């Protein structure tokens, strides 16, 4: 099961970092993707490295949506509690299917014979095969 978190505002780097860290504490979340418009080239206050669960990540987008793969509906309630705590504005939680779970013909073309090396949890999330 997947959930889209759709805030009614674009998130700052600080809010993105805070949200991802709080979501990272929830059991039942398998993976997350942030989506948004690319930050402009050059200096920008939101172009920085954020730390999520001890891992440094270079933020390259102004976060507009967060897609979360979850194990069950109970996890969705925990996500709602985190969003209520982090967001001082309205947002929507939209259940649906947002992650690919199977390798496609496009993956086979993109990765060639290495397509079998692509871990299931990275299907739809990467353009390179990790050794």
UniProtKB/Swiss-Prot annotation:
GO BP: methanogenesis
Keyword 4Fe-4S attached: no
Entry annotated with the keyword Ribonucleoprotein: no
Any one Pfam family match given in the protein's UniProt record, by short name: MCR_D
InterPro entries noted in UniProt: Me_CoM_Rdtase_D
Keywords: Methanogenesis
Subunit structure: MCR is composed of three subunits: alpha, beta, and gamma. The function of proteins C and D is not known.
Protein name from the UniProt record: Methyl-coenzyme M reductase operon protein D
Annotated source species: Methanothermus fervidus
């Amino acid at each position: 099961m997947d959930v889209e978190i759709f805030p009614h505002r674009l998130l700052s780097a600080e809010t993105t970092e805070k949200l991802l860290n709080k979501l990272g504490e929830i059991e039942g979340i398998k993976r997350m993707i942030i989506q948004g418009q690319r930050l402009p080239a050059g200096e920008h206050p939101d172009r920085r490295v954020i730390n999520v669960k001890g891992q440094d990540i270079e933020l390259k987008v102004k976060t507009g949506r967060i897609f979360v793969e979850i194990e069950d509906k109970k996890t969705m309630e925990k996500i709602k509690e985190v969003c209520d705590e982090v967001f001082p504005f309205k947002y929507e939680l939209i259940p649906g299917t947002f992650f690919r779970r199977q390798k496609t013909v496009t993956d086979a073309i993109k990765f060639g014979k290495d397509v079998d090396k692509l871990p299931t949890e990275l299907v739809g999330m990467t353009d390179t095969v990790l050794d």
